[in-house]
């Protein structure tokens, strides 16, 4: 019997297999209508991997994942795999997934300090590009504890301090890095920028302090000018004695002196030491008001009324609000009494009246037409005094 060679037998077997294979329809091919979706399920050709892998839906991908992240591998190998995965995400600018991968690598708690330092530094970079500068700074700080001379961590930390406007710290980190490599361009550029911003910030702080001191001095001078004129502020109407008023009131008044009222007016003093007040005029008949932003203390009421009512206001439909017809009052709220102010009086004369109290550093007066029915009704039942 003639013996057949092994190769001939193999070839004959393969030929018969191929003949049988060709005669049978192929059942594992793509469907024409959805071949792109099926193609995307092949791990090699996936454009984006799913965030959660279902073994039933993607068995091939689940198999690959189990191989890559085999828990039986050493912590160092697993951490290195997560580092590489994070790097791939980082290159794709998918910084959130990169952070997750680096975090998983750190969770392996491998014994390699250099690898852990790289994981911290890389995660810091991803956090930085996400705008999480504080988290990024925490990571590079952890990296430097493991590897003090890690230049990339130092550069990233300096950048974080710069973004957080910690300019002094940014300069310090740059100086520490330049001790390792005095020619590192990134550190040199960062230091120059941080130092410039630090000097600008320090200058602005000095200017702000000088401005605050100047304002405080001006406010103290204004407060002394008010007290020298025996003008009573509203807090003094609460029955406080002079000492408690000067203690408790000063802070309140100084705050008010530094603030503008809603219309932007503020108590001021001229070169001769004379005061100008923001003064509010109320017209209860029509629920209207006027604010004189700078009523000089030596000016008379009639002088302002002549200007304010030189033309008839739009709301004065009866055209009765003429300077000669107007009466000016201030109210003593404690006693529920009114005081009629002579138009020829100066503002200072009225403010020095023993029953006048200035509220919110803005003197307020009521104005109405003396001969009108509204004025008679408004004054009915009220005790009215005449200011002399």
UniProtKB/Swiss-Prot annotation:
The record marks 152, 156 as: Essential for interaction with HSPA8. This is Tetratricopeptide repeat protein 4. The modification Phosphoserine is found at residues 51, 244. The modification N-acetylmethionine is found at residue 1. Keywords: Acetylation, Antiviral defense, Cytoplasm, Immunity, Innate immunity, Nucleus, Phosphoprotein, Repeat, TPR repeat. Interacts (via TPR repeats) with HSP90AB1. Interacts with HSPA8, CDC6, TBK1 and MSL1. GO terms for molecular function: Hsp70 protein binding; Hsp90 protein binding. The lineage of its organism: Eukaryota, Metazoa, Chordata, Craniata, Vertebrata. TPR repeats lie at residues 79-112, 117-150, 151-184. Belongs to the TTC4 family.
């Amino acid at each position: 019997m003639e013996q057949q060679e092994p190769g001939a037998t193999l070839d004959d077997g393969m030929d018969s297999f191929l003949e049988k294979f060709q005669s049978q329809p192929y059942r594992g091919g793509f469907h024409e209508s959805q071949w792109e979706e099926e193609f995307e399920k092949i791990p090699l050709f996936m454009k984006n991997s799913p965030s959660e892998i279902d073994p039933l839906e993607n068995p091939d991908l689940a198999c690959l994942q189990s191989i890559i992240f085999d828990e039986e591998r050493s912590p160092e190998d697993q951490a290195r795999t997560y580092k590489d995965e994070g790097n791939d995400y980082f290159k794709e600018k998918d910084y959130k997934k990169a952070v997750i991968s680096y975090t998983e690598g750190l969770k392996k708690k491998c014994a390699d300090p250099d690898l852990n330092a790289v994981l911290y530094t890389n995660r810091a970079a991803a956090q930085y590009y996400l705008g999480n500068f504080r988290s990024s700074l925490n990571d590079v700080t952890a990296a430097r504890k493991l590897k003090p001379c890690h230049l990339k961590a130092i550069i990233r930390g300096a950048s974080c301090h710069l973004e957080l406007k910690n300019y002094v710290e940014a300069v310090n980190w740059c100086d520490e890095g330049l001790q390792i490599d005095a020619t590192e361009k990134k550190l040199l550029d960062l230091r120059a920028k941080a130092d410039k911003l630090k000097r600008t910030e320090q200058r602005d702080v000095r200017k702000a302090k000088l401005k605050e001191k100047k304002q405080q001095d001006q406010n103290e001078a204004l407060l002394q000018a008010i007290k020298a004129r025996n003008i009573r502020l509203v807090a003094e109407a609460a029955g406080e004695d002079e000492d408690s008023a000067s203690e408790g009131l000063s802070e309140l008044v100084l705050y008010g002196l530094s603030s503008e009222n809603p219309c932007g007016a503020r108590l001021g003093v001229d070169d001769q030491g004379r005061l100008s007040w923001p003064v509010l005029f109320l017209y209860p008949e029509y629920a209207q008001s006027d604010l004189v932003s700078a009523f000089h203390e030596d000016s008379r009421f009639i002088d302002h009324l002549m200007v304010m009512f030189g033309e008839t206001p739009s709301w004065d439909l009866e055209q009765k609000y003429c300077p000669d017809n107007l009466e000016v009052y201030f109210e003593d709220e404690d006693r529920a009494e009114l005081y009629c102010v002579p138009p020829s009086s100066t503002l200072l004369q009225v403010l020095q009246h023993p029953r006048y109290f200035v509220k919110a550093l803005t003197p307020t007066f009521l104005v109405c037409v003396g001969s009108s029915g509204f004025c008679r009704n408004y004054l009915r039942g009220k005790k009215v005094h005449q200011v002399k």
